[in-house]
Amino acid sequence: MFSPLLFFAVSISCVLANSNEIKDGGSDRGAHSDRAGLWFGPRLGKRSLRISTEDNRQAFFKLLEAADALKYYYDRLPYEMQADEPETRVTKKVIFTPKLGRSLAYDDKVFENVEFTPRLGRRLADDMPATPADQELYRPDPDQIDSRTKYFSPRLGRTMNFSPRLGRELSYDMLPSKLRLVRSTNRTQST
């Protein structure tokens, strides 16, 4: 029936078909194959670097032509169909409110020379004060100076205005200097 030669040919073809030596493109198992990814040739499917800048120049010139044509046709559109410029106007109005306790005139005399700010603890000459507040704070008003401040010194930076408590504002100038008030326990009359 079968000849040994035919049997030998069929067995050789089966061995060659199942061998790892002959691979089809779809049957490669990559790193799980017997070769275990030891392929030192160029990476298949990777694009090679094209050094020719002539193609890049041509593509760049085509883009410039397209942009120029787009601008030309955009400028030919009616004004109503063109996109508006981005709005530059201020949509929120800022209302300036000065800080409490400060006047607008105070801002004018804060610094004459803005570039120079003295270090802390340094005093400037009288013709160029650090701030007007220094001049105003360290020279007390003569109205606020009382004779009793000699005996009592308030904390630094404070001025003391001695006024009596509410209901105790008495004017001693209106009373006579020789007035004598006496109460007697035995109902005697005073002179």
Swiss-Prot record:
Listed GO CC annotations: extracellular region
GO biological process: neuropeptide signaling pathway; pheromone biosynthetic process
Classification via Pfam families: PBAN
The keyword Secreted belongs to this UniProt entry's keyword annotation: yes
GO molecular function: neuropeptide hormone activity
Record family assignment: Belongs to the pyrokinin family.
Protein name: PBAN-type neuropeptides
Modified residues (Leucine amide): L44, L100, L120, L156, L166
Tissue expression: Expressed in the subesophageal ganglion.
Keywords: Amidation, Cleavage on pair of basic residues, Hormone, Neuropeptide, Secreted, Signal
Subcellular location: Secreted
Role played: A hormone that controls sex pheromone production in females and pheromone responsiveness in male.
Signal peptide: 1-17
Native species: Spodoptera littoralis (Egyptian cotton leafworm)
UniProt propeptide residues: 48-91, 169-191
Protein origin, superkingdom: Eukaryota
